[in-house]
């Protein structure tokens, strides 16, 4: 997997609960020939301003299964995913144990493909204005 692009959420606080979304394309390449499948796992730190205010550790989710497509000009066997949604991205002051956000069952996921995840971020009405950041770790491992 190549380094995933950053995810940027943007919200204008208006005194109401909001959900903002952002997409992230994850380029996955499995040329092992093992047909063992693979897992994308993720974890994160809590969204914080650095000055105190934070968002809930359950604020980032994936509401429905990511889309997937073979990369242009390549041949692939699209991944068959068994992860249930909605998915909550684990978060904590120190990133907790990563969990599966997407997987390829055995005999699927061979070749080059892009898995596109639509992340949702819950922004409560009482959110203190500021720039919130979080560090995410997304990993690719062999096996169903």
Q: Which role does the model predict for each range below?
A:
Residues 1-144:
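Signature of Gram-negative chaperone-usher
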């Amino acid at each position: 997997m190549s380094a995933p692009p950053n995810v940027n959420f943007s919200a204008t606080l208006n005194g109401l609960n909001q959900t903002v979304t952002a997409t992230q394309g994850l380029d996955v390449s499995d040329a092992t020939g093992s047909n063992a499948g693979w897992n994308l796992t993720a974890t994160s730190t809590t969204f914080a301003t650095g000055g105190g205010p934070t968002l809930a550790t359950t604020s980032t989710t994936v509401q429905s299964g990511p889309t997937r497509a073979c990369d242009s000009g390549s041949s692939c066997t699209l991944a068959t995913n068994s992860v249930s949604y909605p998915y909550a991205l684990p978060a904590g002051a120190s990133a907790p144990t990563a969990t599966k956000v997407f997987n390829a069952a055995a005999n699927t996921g061979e070749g080059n493909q892009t898995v596109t995840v639509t992340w949702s971020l819950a922004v409560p009405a009482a959110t203190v204005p500021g720039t919130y950041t979080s560090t995410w770790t997304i990993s690719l491992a062999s096996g169903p």
